[in-house]
Regions:
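N-terminal Rossmann-like dinucleotide-binding module
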Residues: 2-3, 7, 12-55
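Internal anion-binding site segments
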Residues: 3, 210-263
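Conserved beta-strand segments of alpha/beta enzyme cores
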Residues: 18, 41, 72-74, 117
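Short beta->alpha connector loops
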Residues: 24-27, 79-82, 102-105
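Amphipathic, non-transmembrane alpha-helical secondary structure
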Residues: 29, 33-37, 87-91, 108, ...
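Donor/substrate-binding cores of folate-linked one-carbon enzymes
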Residues: 38-41, 48, 97-215, 222
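N-terminal glycine-/serine-/threonine-rich beta1-alpha1-beta2 phosphate-ribose binding loop
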Residues: 52-96
Length: 263
């Protein structure tokens, strides 16, 4: 990837840690590619099993799996994270650190395996927007900034002690897709900086302020219907917050459903 090569020029030093990378979608795959380009020792990638997609329902690998295989990195695809064979395979890797991006909730038996610990790269400034869809909800709720937080894993989702964070502005007409891409690049940089900091032992984990926490739950089709009775700015934020995926939906007079991506 040319973008990865360009981004890598500012950070050439690797942490020297043995890292297992957990992730699935493009957001995670870009970060994995960046870490590899910066010399990180990714000893394995963990992702979801291949899923049937398209008209022919052919099995398609995840974006993370494709990147890992292109670099000859072993791939683990557990269906159950508490499976004893999977946990044994992870333990044999003798990893220093787990890096988790847009993956499933890891049980304690898994995230406590590495010597240094396991950290997540989350697309919000925690404790705001804990949950599965932080990018969408930040825009829907009219926030003027977002960012990336890296934090140590704990049993409860997105509650662990913060390692690093960096914010970016959200432009008035910016869509979720555009913010996704901006945070994907920032997440790669901050993920690498987190690995460097962990290897040097110079990060000071900071407890999150739970009283300031907000949530960003998963978005379902029923959540995507536009309510035109709301103020224009709220409708505008709703449309761009769901653009391009899953898309804000309205119904025409003839019953046809239409996705609106801009307003």
């Amino acid at each position: 990837m040319s973008s990865t090569t360009m981004e890598s020029s500012g950070l050439k030093k690797s942490s020297g840690l043995k890292v297992v990378f957990f992730g699935t979608p493009e957001f995670a795959a870009h970060i994995l590619e960046y870490l590899i380009a910066n010399g990180e020792n990714i000893v394995a990638a963990v992702t979801i099993p291949d899923k049937p997609q398209g008209r022919g329902l052919k099995l398609r690998p995840s974006a993370v799996k494709l990147v890992a295989l292109s670099h000859n990195i072993p791939v683990l695809e557990p269906t159950k994270l508490r499976d004893s064979d999977f946990i044994e395979a992870l333990a044999k890797l003798d990893a220093d650190c787990f890096c988790v991006v847009a993956y499933r909730i890891l049980p304690r038996d898994v995230y406590t395996l590495p010597k240094i610990g396991a950290f997540n790269i989350h697309a919000s400034i925690l404790p705001k927007y804990r949950g599965a869809a932080p990018i969408n909800w930040a825009i829907i709720r009219g926030e003027t900034e977002s960012g990336i937080t890296t934090f140590l894993l704990e049993d409860k989702v997105d509650t662990g002690n913060v390692l690093l964070k960096e914010s970016v502005p959200i432009r008035p007409n910016e869509t979720a897709g555009e913010l996704h891409d901006a945070l994907m690049h920032l997440g790669a940089k901050l993920g690498h900086e987190t690995l460097l900091g962990l290897s040097l032992g110079n990060l000071a984990p900071k407890k999150q302020l739970d009283t300031a926490a907000t949530t960003a739950p998963k978005i379902f089709p029923a959540d995507c219907i536009i309510d035109f009775s709301k103020p224009a700015i709220e409708v505008h934020n709703f449309i761009r917050g769901l653009s391009p995926h899953p898309g804000a939906i309205t119904t025409l007079h003839n019953g046809a459903k239409v996705k609106l991506l801009r307003s």
